[in-house]
Amino acid sequence: MIIVGNGNCGVNFFLSFNKEHFTKKKLLKYIDGMSRTDFLIDHLEYGSFVKDDLKQIFNFNVLRGKSDYKYILKQITRTSLKVKKPDIILLDNWGDMNFTAWKCKKTNRRIWICNQEKREDYLNNYKQFIEDFDKCGYLSYEQSIENYKKLIKHYRRNNPNCPVIFINIYTQLWKKDYHRNFYEKIPYDLQKIIPNFFIGYVDKNKLKTHNGKPGLHFTKENYQEMFNNLKEQGFNYNLLNK
């Protein structure tokens, strides 16, 4: 089975806590995380930065040892786009919900700097950076919808009916992203216009974080409920035996 997609904690925990369903056969997973949808769409036209480019932009001496170090590197992976014929497309909405971006004036390539408001110390030369990049801010809801449509179309280019599973990220237990909670509607709007599209959702009243603290990582039971709720939407479980 080949799974492709764009996602982060939602996708990863969904697979981890439902692994008995996805590992009946050999599983090949190509998930590009820590990227917004526009980063992937842009790659098809402009390419992407590589690690050596990031070394010129970011101060890795400051970053090394921090979680943001590996996350910043992950934002340039594009393995999912190369897969010719996936069996399942797996997405979540956290990247578009969370990241603000900067766009390179010369190459039109985009990156994010960090999760915090200001981390100038992450950059080798902040003054040079703001001369070379334009601040894009957040994606709008409408931009995100269009990007998901384009991304799914690309993934489906050789398998037009490839099912999409979209893991919904809920913000009610994480105040930092609550101002972007309207992104929870995205999978429902996409489902109206994209066939063979399934939503990994859970009853919000049952939401609990895995460690009892504020966050976006939920319990095993929550992710298992997301899987079980696919069936009522018509998801063909026989695909998981492929």
Identify what each model region corresponds to.
Residues 1-242:
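Extracellular glycan-modifying ectodomains
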